[in-house]
């Protein structure tokens, strides 16, 4: 038996609903990947507590973001369509610089997803979704990118790509 359309759904195009579902999936994948990073830095042979804490917080933030979009989906009368989450491409990170670089690229993907969703909302005449993204996501995501870009610059300038001591100091002094 087919589901009846929601009575709540008004001015909510299926492409907006689809863009939100795509973003939810990306957030859940990012949360999973950040959890993998946190677990790596918690290993006894790596033991970088602040990197672990940083990536664990990122994992929780992505999970919270996915939940926020699921709530929005329900509020608008849409349907969250959850898919299987692919496992992270790697379980071992060759240090903080590589993990931070990967995290930065993940945040760039999240930013692009938000921008794509905003564009779809504008094209489909959905001021509610545009406002939601502008108030809750877009500026915050730019701040995240700025912070992580600064971390990468600091790690690079300290020579963390070649020297473990620089990475250790970054963990102790910058991420604490």
Curated annotation (Swiss-Prot):
It holds the Pfam family Ferritin. Fe cation binds at residues 27, 107, 141. GO terms for biological process: intracellular iron ion homeostasis; iron ion transport. InterPro entries: Ferritin, Ferritin-like, Ferritin-like_diiron, Ferritin-like_SF, Ferritin_CS, Ferritin_DPS_dom. Residues 10-159 form the Ferritin-like diiron domain. Keywords: Iron, Iron storage, Metal-binding. The keyword Iron applies. One of its GO terms (molecular function) is ferric iron binding. Coiled coil: none annotated. Expressed in the testes and spermatogonia. Gene3D superfamilies: 1.20.1260.10. Belongs to the ferritin family. PANTHER family: FERRITIN, FERRITIN HEAVY POLYPEPTIDE-LIKE 17-RELATED. This is Ferritin heavy polypeptide-like 17E. It comes from Mus musculus (Mouse).
